[in-house]
Amino acid sequence: MGCGDIAADLEGGGPWPLGGRRFEGVVVTNYLHRPLLPRLVDSLAPGGVLIYETFARGNERFGRPSNPAFLLAPGELLEAVRGRLQIVAYEHGVVARPKPAVVQRLCAAAGDGLFDITSR
C-alpha cells in the first residue's frame, strides 16, 4: 500500500508508464484523453474502483473548456465502460460549485459479481 509519483506524458504515444500494474482505485478529474479510457479500465485490480469526473457538452455556456474535443457526449462515460465494469453510480448535469459547469461523473467497479458497496 502506498502512493507514489510518476511523471509521464500520457498523450505522447509512448509506452504506458504503469506497465501491467493493477490498482484498487483510479481517480480522474477534469481531464479527458479518450484513447486512455481502455487503459484506465485495464489498470483496475479485480474489485477495483474507477471514479471519473470531467466536463461534458453544454459546458460551453459556462466557459472553458468549450472545445467539443474536450467535452464528453451524453452517456459517453457509460459507453466507455459498458460490458467491462459494473456501474455503481452515474450523473450527468449542471453543478454550481466550485463554479458552474456541465459534468459527467462515473463510479464503476471491476468484477463480474455484485459490488458490495457496504464494505468499502
List the model feature ranges, each with a label.
Residues 7, 28:
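Conserved residues in the N-terminal Rossmann fold of short-chain dehydrogenase/reductase
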Residues 11, 15-25:
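A short acidic, Gly/Pro-enriched loop at the edge of an enzyme's catalytic core
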Residues 31-45:
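A short, conserved alpha-helix within the catalytic core of class I
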Residues 47-60:
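Conserved beta-strand signature within the Rossmann-like core of class I S-adenosyl-L-methionine
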Residues 60-75, 96-97:
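Acceptor-substrate binding/catalytic loop of class I
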Residues 68-84, 88-91:
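Short alpha-helix
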Residues 92-120:
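Core SAM-dependent methyltransferase catalytic element
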